[in-house]
A protein has these predicted regions:
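Enrichment for repetitive, rod-forming helical segments
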Residues: 27-30, 87, 117
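Amphipathic alpha-helical interface elements
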Residues: 2-82, 101, 151-159, 164
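Charge-enriched, short contiguous segments at helix-coil
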Residues: 89-156, 160-163
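Amphipathic, heptad-repeat alpha-helical segments
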Residues: 78-94
Length: 164
């Protein structure tokens, strides 16, 4: 997704790039939930209400005002990061709140874009800035930094072909 977002920026498709970057930020939270708590929210599965409540401290179990569909919680992006913070070091990611606060305004740019809920265009500079922040988030999630993420992205990048 990160490489794909980079290609979209190169093509001048900034809203498309930011939509992919938004999904990348959400995917980081989903992977952390699966990795740390065994809670599978990939493929839109939703979080099973009982599983989530059992992992949270009792004083936090009623904190989340979320939609419930077929016995599963449907969490938004912000709520996934809050949940990771609230689950604590054993089942969560204590840095999650700090990470989300650092990208929250940028994620709002996606929400205001034509590909989401608004009509405000995303500029090239905004897309590139968001891309850098998302690389950093991926690196922090892996606990090995954005440089490692950049290196990994180079290994999966499409080869450049020049046509004459």
């Amino acid at each position: 997704l990160l490489c794909n977002a980079g290609r979209r920026i190169e093509e001048g498709k900034y809203e498309d790039a930011v939509a992919r970057l938004y999904r990348s930020v959400e995917l980081v939270a989903q992977i952390k939930l699966l990795e740390k708590a065994g809670v599978d929210d990939l493929e839109g599965a939703g979080l099973r209400a009982g599983v989530v409540c059992n992992l949270l401290p009792k004083e936090m179990q009623g904190r989340y005002q979320v939609r419930e569909v077929d016995g599963k919680f449907v969490f938004g992006l912000r709520q996934k990061y809050e949940l990771l913070k609230d689950l604590g070091p054993k089942y969560g990611w204590p840095k999650a709140d700090e990470v989300y606060r650092g990208i929250q305004a940028d994620m709002e740019k996606r929400n205001r874009s034509v590909l989401a809920h608004g009509i405000t265009p995303v500029t090239k500079e905004e897309a590139e800035q968001i891309q850098e922040k998302v690389r950093d988030i991926a690196g922090r999630a892996l606990d090995n930094g954005a440089n490692t993420v950049r290196d990994a992205m180079r290994t999966v990048a499409f080869p450049r072909v020049e046509w004459k």
